[in-house]
Amino acid sequence: MQTLADLLNTIPAIDPAAMSRAQRHIDGLLKPVGSLGRLEALAIQLAGMPGLNGIPHVGKKAVLVMCADHGVWEEGVAISPKEVTAIQAENMTRGTTGVCVLAAQAGANVHVVDVGIDSAEPIPGLINMRVARGSGNIASAPAMSRRQAEKLLLDVICYTRELAKNGVTLFGVGELGMANTTPAAAIVSTITGRDPEEVVGIGANLPTDKLANKIDVVRRAITLNQPNPQDGIDVLAKVGGFDLVGIAGVMLGAASCGLPVLLDGFLSYAAALAACQMSPAIKPYLIPSHLSVEKGARIALSHLGLEPYLNMDMRLGEGSGAALAMPIIEAACAIYNNMGELAASNIVLPGNTTSDLNS
Protein backbone atom coordinates (compact mmCIF):
# COMPACT_ATOMS: atom_id res chain seq x y z
CA MET A 1 0.00 0.00 0.00
CA GLN A 2 1.30 3.45 -0.93
CA THR A 3 2.07 5.89 1.84
CA LEU A 4 0.70 9.42 1.97
CA ALA A 5 4.14 10.78 1.12
CA ASP A 6 4.34 8.49 -1.92
CA LEU A 7 0.96 9.68 -3.20
CA LEU A 8 1.76 13.35 -2.66
CA ASN A 9 4.97 12.95 -4.66
CA THR A 10 3.38 11.17 -7.61
CA ILE A 11 0.70 13.65 -8.73
CA PRO A 12 1.03 13.58 -12.54
CA ALA A 13 1.90 16.79 -14.33
CA ILE A 14 -0.52 18.35 -16.77
CA ASP A 15 0.36 17.46 -20.39
CA PRO A 16 1.23 20.68 -22.29
CA ALA A 17 1.44 18.88 -25.64
CA ALA A 18 -2.12 17.59 -25.24
CA MET A 19 -3.27 21.10 -24.36
CA SER A 20 -1.59 22.51 -27.47
CA ARG A 21 -3.30 19.91 -29.65
CA ALA A 22 -6.62 20.75 -28.01
CA GLN A 23 -6.07 24.45 -28.65
CA ARG A 24 -5.46 23.82 -32.35
CA HIS A 25 -8.50 21.56 -32.56
CA ILE A 26 -10.77 24.11 -30.88
CA ASP A 27 -9.47 26.96 -33.03
CA GLY A 28 -10.50 24.95 -36.09
CA LEU A 29 -14.11 24.38 -35.03
CA LEU A 30 -17.12 26.02 -36.67
CA LYS A 31 -16.93 29.35 -34.85
CA PRO A 32 -14.78 32.46 -34.61
CA VAL A 33 -11.59 31.78 -32.66
CA GLY A 34 -12.16 32.27 -28.94
CA SER A 35 -15.88 32.94 -29.30
CA LEU A 36 -16.87 30.33 -26.72
CA GLY A 37 -14.67 32.02 -24.16
CA ARG A 38 -14.02 30.17 -20.92
CA LEU A 39 -15.75 27.07 -22.26
CA GLU A 40 -12.86 26.70 -24.71
CA ALA A 41 -10.28 27.23 -21.97
CA LEU A 42 -12.03 24.62 -19.83
CA ALA A 43 -11.93 22.05 -22.64
CA ILE A 44 -8.21 22.71 -23.10
CA GLN A 45 -7.61 22.36 -19.36
CA LEU A 46 -9.41 19.02 -19.36
CA ALA A 47 -7.42 17.82 -22.38
CA GLY A 48 -4.22 18.31 -20.41
CA MET A 49 -5.30 16.00 -17.60
CA PRO A 50 -3.57 12.61 -18.06
CA GLY A 51 -6.52 10.68 -16.65
CA LEU A 52 -8.64 11.80 -19.62
CA ASN A 53 -6.04 10.67 -22.18
CA GLY A 54 -5.96 13.91 -24.12
CA ILE A 55 -9.67 13.94 -24.99
CA PRO A 56 -12.06 15.96 -22.80
CA HIS A 57 -14.86 13.63 -21.74
CA VAL A 58 -17.02 12.74 -18.75
CA GLY A 59 -17.67 9.19 -17.64
CA LYS A 60 -19.26 8.56 -14.28
CA LYS A 61 -19.73 11.52 -11.92
CA ALA A 62 -19.51 11.50 -8.14
CA VAL A 63 -19.99 14.08 -5.39
CA LEU A 64 -18.27 13.11 -2.14
CA VAL A 65 -19.81 14.79 0.91
CA MET A 66 -17.65 14.76 4.04
CA CYS A 67 -19.72 14.93 7.25
CA ALA A 68 -18.31 15.85 10.66
CA ASP A 69 -19.03 17.76 13.83
CA HIS A 70 -16.78 20.39 15.38
CA GLY A 71 -15.88 21.00 19.00
CA VAL A 72 -15.76 24.74 18.31
CA TRP A 73 -19.56 24.66 18.09
CA GLU A 74 -19.45 25.01 21.88
CA GLU A 75 -18.16 28.58 21.46
CA GLY A 76 -21.50 29.85 20.12
CA VAL A 77 -20.30 30.32 16.55
CA ALA A 78 -23.35 28.64 14.96
CA ILE A 79 -27.08 28.89 15.60
CA SER A 80 -28.06 25.43 14.39
CA PRO A 81 -28.13 22.60 16.96
CA LYS A 82 -25.17 20.26 16.58
CA GLU A 83 -27.59 17.35 16.06
CA VAL A 84 -28.51 18.80 12.67
CA THR A 85 -25.32 17.29 11.22
CA ALA A 86 -26.52 13.73 11.90
CA ILE A 87 -30.09 14.54 10.86
CA GLN A 88 -29.04 16.04 7.54
CA ALA A 89 -26.58 13.23 6.86
CA GLU A 90 -29.44 10.78 7.25
CA ASN A 91 -31.57 12.94 4.94
CA MET A 92 -28.81 12.69 2.35
CA THR A 93 -29.19 8.92 2.34
CA ARG A 94 -32.83 9.52 1.34
CA GLY A 95 -31.85 11.88 -1.48
CA THR A 96 -33.86 14.81 -0.13
CA THR A 97 -31.18 17.45 0.50
CA GLY A 98 -30.07 20.19 -1.88
CA VAL A 99 -26.95 18.45 -3.10
CA CYS A 100 -28.82 15.19 -3.68
CA VAL A 101 -31.45 16.87 -5.83
CA LEU A 102 -28.89 18.82 -7.85
CA ALA A 103 -26.60 15.80 -8.24
CA ALA A 104 -29.50 13.67 -9.46
CA GLN A 105 -30.31 16.38 -12.01
CA ALA A 106 -26.67 16.24 -13.17
CA GLY A 107 -26.61 12.43 -13.25
CA ALA A 108 -24.06 12.17 -10.44
CA ASN A 109 -23.93 9.77 -7.53
CA VAL A 110 -23.63 11.22 -4.03
CA HIS A 111 -21.30 9.45 -1.60
CA VAL A 112 -22.08 10.51 1.97
CA VAL A 113 -19.04 9.91 4.18
CA ASP A 114 -19.04 10.02 7.98
CA VAL A 115 -15.59 11.26 8.93
CA GLY A 116 -16.52 12.60 12.37
CA ILE A 117 -20.23 12.88 13.17
CA ASP A 118 -21.01 13.13 16.89
CA SER A 119 -23.53 10.30 17.12
CA ALA A 120 -23.56 7.26 19.39
CA GLU A 121 -23.92 4.77 16.55
CA PRO A 122 -22.93 4.81 12.88
CA ILE A 123 -25.70 6.13 10.64
CA PRO A 124 -27.03 3.50 8.21
CA GLY A 125 -26.31 4.27 4.58
CA LEU A 126 -23.22 6.38 5.23
CA ILE A 127 -19.68 5.37 4.30
CA ASN A 128 -18.01 5.00 7.68
CA MET A 129 -14.58 6.63 7.92
CA ARG A 130 -15.28 8.19 11.30
CA VAL A 131 -12.13 9.26 13.12
CA ALA A 132 -13.84 10.51 16.28
CA ARG A 133 -17.14 11.96 17.46
CA GLY A 134 -16.30 15.46 16.34
CA SER A 135 -13.03 17.36 16.26
CA GLY A 136 -11.44 19.16 19.19
CA ASN A 137 -12.49 22.70 20.08
CA ILE A 138 -9.90 24.73 18.18
CA ALA A 139 -10.38 27.66 20.56
CA SER A 140 -8.82 25.61 23.34
CA ALA A 141 -7.00 22.67 21.68
CA PRO A 142 -5.96 21.29 18.28
CA ALA A 143 -8.74 19.94 16.07
CA MET A 144 -6.98 16.56 15.89
CA SER A 145 -3.55 14.97 15.97
CA ARG A 146 -1.33 15.02 12.91
CA ARG A 147 -1.51 11.22 12.84
CA GLN A 148 -5.32 11.38 12.65
CA ALA A 149 -5.17 13.91 9.84
CA GLU A 150 -2.67 11.86 7.84
CA LYS A 151 -4.60 8.63 8.24
CA LEU A 152 -7.88 10.23 7.16
CA LEU A 153 -6.21 11.86 4.18
CA LEU A 154 -4.83 8.51 3.07
CA ASP A 155 -8.15 6.71 3.61
CA VAL A 156 -10.07 9.27 1.53
CA ILE A 157 -7.41 9.35 -1.18
CA CYS A 158 -7.61 5.56 -1.49
CA TYR A 159 -11.42 5.64 -1.61
CA THR A 160 -11.33 8.32 -4.32
CA ARG A 161 -8.81 6.35 -6.35
CA GLU A 162 -11.01 3.26 -6.11
CA LEU A 163 -13.93 5.25 -7.53
CA ALA A 164 -11.69 6.34 -10.40
CA LYS A 165 -10.81 2.71 -11.10
CA ASN A 166 -14.54 2.03 -11.33
CA GLY A 167 -15.10 4.65 -14.01
CA VAL A 168 -15.58 7.98 -12.23
CA THR A 169 -13.86 10.71 -14.25
CA LEU A 170 -15.41 13.80 -12.65
CA PHE A 171 -15.41 14.42 -8.92
CA GLY A 172 -17.18 17.06 -6.86
CA VAL A 173 -16.59 17.84 -3.20
CA GLY A 174 -19.04 18.78 -0.47
CA GLU A 175 -19.34 18.91 3.30
CA LEU A 176 -21.79 18.87 6.16
CA GLY A 177 -21.07 20.01 9.71
CA MET A 178 -22.51 22.60 12.06
CA ALA A 179 -20.02 25.41 12.83
CA ASN A 180 -17.63 24.33 10.08
CA THR A 181 -17.21 27.80 8.56
CA THR A 182 -15.26 28.70 11.71
CA PRO A 183 -12.35 26.27 11.12
CA ALA A 184 -12.56 27.05 7.40
CA ALA A 185 -12.04 30.73 8.17
CA ALA A 186 -9.13 29.83 10.45
CA ILE A 187 -7.49 27.91 7.60
CA VAL A 188 -8.02 30.75 5.12
CA SER A 189 -6.68 33.33 7.57
CA THR A 190 -3.63 31.19 8.35
CA ILE A 191 -2.61 30.37 4.79
CA THR A 192 -3.43 33.73 3.17
CA GLY A 193 -2.08 35.78 6.06
CA ARG A 194 -5.24 37.86 6.21
CA ASP A 195 -6.77 38.97 9.50
CA PRO A 196 -9.72 36.88 10.76
CA GLU A 197 -11.96 39.93 10.53
CA GLU A 198 -11.44 39.92 6.76
CA VAL A 199 -12.44 36.28 6.24
CA VAL A 200 -15.02 35.40 8.91
CA GLY A 201 -18.61 35.48 7.67
CA ILE A 202 -22.07 34.60 8.91
CA GLY A 203 -22.02 30.98 7.76
CA ALA A 204 -25.51 29.50 8.11
CA ASN A 205 -27.27 32.75 9.04
CA LEU A 206 -25.35 33.63 12.19
CA PRO A 207 -26.84 36.88 13.58
CA THR A 208 -24.54 39.82 12.93
CA ASP A 209 -24.39 40.63 16.64
CA LYS A 210 -22.61 37.29 17.17
CA LEU A 211 -20.03 37.87 14.44
CA ALA A 212 -17.52 39.58 16.73
CA ASN A 213 -17.42 36.47 18.92
CA LYS A 214 -16.81 34.25 15.89
CA ILE A 215 -13.95 36.48 14.77
CA ASP A 216 -12.47 36.35 18.26
CA VAL A 217 -12.77 32.55 18.34
CA VAL A 218 -10.87 32.24 15.05
CA ARG A 219 -8.19 34.63 16.27
CA ARG A 220 -7.81 32.71 19.54
CA ALA A 221 -7.61 29.39 17.69
CA ILE A 222 -4.76 30.61 15.49
CA THR A 223 -2.90 32.24 18.39
CA LEU A 224 -3.22 29.16 20.59
CA ASN A 225 -2.43 26.45 18.04
CA GLN A 226 0.17 28.31 15.94
CA PRO A 227 -0.44 26.40 12.68
CA ASN A 228 2.42 26.50 10.19
CA PRO A 229 1.03 28.16 7.02
CA GLN A 230 3.62 26.32 4.90
CA ASP A 231 2.42 22.90 6.13
CA GLY A 232 -1.09 22.05 4.94
CA ILE A 233 -1.39 18.99 7.16
CA ASP A 234 -0.36 21.00 10.22
CA VAL A 235 -2.98 23.65 9.43
CA LEU A 236 -5.74 21.07 9.00
CA ALA A 237 -4.77 19.21 12.17
CA LYS A 238 -4.51 22.29 14.36
CA VAL A 239 -7.37 24.56 13.21
CA GLY A 240 -9.32 22.46 10.69
CA GLY A 241 -11.80 19.64 11.02
CA PHE A 242 -12.37 16.10 9.80
CA ASP A 243 -14.66 17.26 6.98
CA LEU A 244 -12.01 19.68 5.73
CA VAL A 245 -9.37 16.94 5.82
CA GLY A 246 -11.72 14.67 3.88
CA ILE A 247 -12.32 17.28 1.18
CA ALA A 248 -8.58 17.78 0.78
CA GLY A 249 -8.24 14.01 0.45
CA VAL A 250 -10.72 13.91 -2.44
CA MET A 251 -8.78 16.63 -4.25
CA LEU A 252 -5.49 14.82 -3.77
CA GLY A 253 -7.01 11.48 -4.75
CA ALA A 254 -8.57 12.80 -7.96
CA ALA A 255 -5.40 14.64 -8.94
CA SER A 256 -3.31 11.53 -8.29
CA CYS A 257 -5.41 9.84 -11.00
CA GLY A 258 -5.02 12.80 -13.35
CA LEU A 259 -8.73 13.66 -13.06
CA PRO A 260 -10.68 16.89 -12.45
CA VAL A 261 -12.37 17.82 -9.21
CA LEU A 262 -15.03 20.51 -8.90
CA LEU A 263 -14.79 22.73 -5.86
CA ASP A 264 -17.92 23.81 -4.03
CA GLY A 265 -18.01 26.83 -1.74
CA PHE A 266 -16.01 28.39 1.10
CA LEU A 267 -15.22 25.11 2.88
CA SER A 268 -13.76 23.66 -0.30
CA TYR A 269 -11.66 26.77 -0.92
CA ALA A 270 -10.16 26.38 2.55
CA ALA A 271 -9.45 22.69 1.98
CA ALA A 272 -7.94 23.50 -1.42
CA LEU A 273 -5.56 26.00 0.16
CA ALA A 274 -4.32 23.29 2.53
CA ALA A 275 -4.18 20.63 -0.19
CA CYS A 276 -2.15 22.90 -2.48
CA GLN A 277 0.34 23.42 0.36
CA MET A 278 0.76 19.64 0.51
CA SER A 279 1.11 19.25 -3.25
CA PRO A 280 1.10 22.33 -5.52
CA ALA A 281 0.85 19.94 -8.49
CA ILE A 282 -2.87 19.41 -7.82
CA LYS A 283 -3.84 23.00 -8.65
CA PRO A 284 -4.45 22.48 -12.42
CA TYR A 285 -6.97 19.74 -11.55
CA LEU A 286 -9.13 22.06 -9.43
CA ILE A 287 -12.15 23.58 -11.16
CA PRO A 288 -14.04 26.29 -9.26
CA SER A 289 -17.80 25.94 -9.57
CA HIS A 290 -19.39 29.01 -7.98
CA LEU A 291 -18.54 32.08 -5.94
CA SER A 292 -19.76 31.59 -2.39
CA VAL A 293 -21.20 34.67 -0.71
CA GLU A 294 -19.27 33.86 2.49
CA LYS A 295 -17.09 36.84 3.38
CA GLY A 296 -13.67 35.28 2.87
CA ALA A 297 -14.52 33.57 -0.42
CA ARG A 298 -12.91 36.04 -2.79
CA ILE A 299 -9.76 36.23 -0.65
CA ALA A 300 -9.35 32.44 -0.71
CA LEU A 301 -10.02 32.17 -4.43
CA SER A 302 -7.63 35.00 -5.22
CA HIS A 303 -4.90 33.20 -3.28
CA LEU A 304 -5.65 30.02 -5.23
CA GLY A 305 -5.69 31.95 -8.51
CA LEU A 306 -9.12 30.58 -9.44
CA GLU A 307 -12.15 32.30 -10.98
CA PRO A 308 -15.51 30.55 -10.49
CA TYR A 309 -17.82 29.83 -13.41
CA LEU A 310 -21.04 30.71 -11.57
CA ASN A 311 -22.19 33.50 -9.28
CA MET A 312 -25.56 32.43 -7.89
CA ASP A 313 -25.51 33.99 -4.38
CA MET A 314 -25.27 30.47 -2.96
CA ARG A 315 -23.90 29.44 0.45
CA LEU A 316 -25.58 26.10 1.15
CA GLY A 317 -22.47 23.97 0.93
CA GLU A 318 -23.03 20.19 0.79
CA GLY A 319 -21.49 20.08 -2.70
CA SER A 320 -24.49 21.88 -4.20
CA GLY A 321 -22.36 24.22 -6.31
CA ALA A 322 -20.16 21.38 -7.54
CA ALA A 323 -23.22 19.43 -8.68
CA LEU A 324 -24.71 22.51 -10.33
CA ALA A 325 -21.54 23.08 -12.37
CA MET A 326 -21.18 19.54 -13.69
CA PRO A 327 -23.19 20.30 -16.85
CA ILE A 328 -20.70 23.07 -17.65
CA ILE A 329 -17.92 20.47 -17.71
CA GLU A 330 -20.04 18.30 -19.99
CA ALA A 331 -20.73 21.29 -22.25
CA ALA A 332 -17.00 21.92 -22.66
CA CYS A 333 -16.53 18.27 -23.61
CA ALA A 334 -19.47 18.43 -26.03
CA ILE A 335 -18.17 21.36 -28.02
CA TYR A 336 -14.76 19.71 -28.27
CA ASN A 337 -16.07 16.37 -29.47
CA ASN A 338 -19.22 17.23 -31.41
CA MET A 339 -18.78 20.53 -33.24
CA GLY A 340 -17.93 20.53 -36.92
CA GLU A 341 -14.71 21.92 -38.36
CA LEU A 342 -14.14 25.03 -40.43
CA ALA A 343 -12.00 23.15 -42.95
CA ALA A 344 -14.75 20.63 -43.66
CA SER A 345 -17.06 23.49 -44.64
CA ASN A 346 -14.39 25.35 -46.65
CA ILE A 347 -14.58 28.33 -44.31
CA VAL A 348 -11.50 30.47 -43.78
CA LEU A 349 -11.72 33.07 -41.02
CA PRO A 350 -9.33 36.02 -40.70
CA GLY A 351 -6.85 35.42 -37.91
CA ASN A 352 -7.26 31.65 -37.92
CA THR A 353 -3.83 30.21 -38.61
CA THR A 354 -4.67 26.60 -37.82
CA SER A 355 -2.91 24.48 -40.41
CA ASP A 356 -3.47 20.96 -39.17
CA LEU A 357 -6.55 20.57 -37.00
CA ASN A 358 -5.89 16.93 -36.24
CA SER A 359 -2.19 17.09 -35.45
Curated annotation (Swiss-Prot):
UniProt enzyme class: transferase
Keyword annotations of the record: Cobalamin biosynthesis, Glycosyltransferase, Transferase
Cleaved signal peptide residues: none
Pathway the protein takes part in: Nucleoside biosynthesis; alpha-ribazole biosynthesis; alpha-ribazole from 5,6-dimethylbenzimidazole: step 1/2
tRNA-binding in keyword set: no
Reactions that this protein is recorded to catalyse: 5,6-dimethylbenzimidazole + nicotinate beta-D-ribonucleotide = alpha-ribazole 5'-phosphate + nicotinate + H(+)
Active site, UniProt feature: E318 (proton acceptor)
Enzyme Commission no: 2.4.2.21
InterPro entries in the record: Nict_dMeBzImd_PRibTrfase, Nict_dMeBzImd_PRibTrfase_bact, Nict_dMeBzImd_PRibTrfase_N, Nict_dMeBzImd_PRibTrfase_sf
One BP annotation, GO: cobalamin biosynthetic process
GO molecular function: nicotinate-nucleotide-dimethylbenzimidazole phosphoribosyltransferase activity
Function, as annotated: Catalyzes the synthesis of alpha-ribazole-5'-phosphate from nicotinate mononucleotide (NAMN) and 5,6-dimethylbenzimidazole (DMB).
Family recorded in the similarity comment: Belongs to the CobT family.
The protein, known as: Nicotinate-nucleotide--dimethylbenzimidazole phosphoribosyltransferase
Gene source species: Escherichia coli O9:H4 (strain HS)
Gene that this sequence comes from: cobT
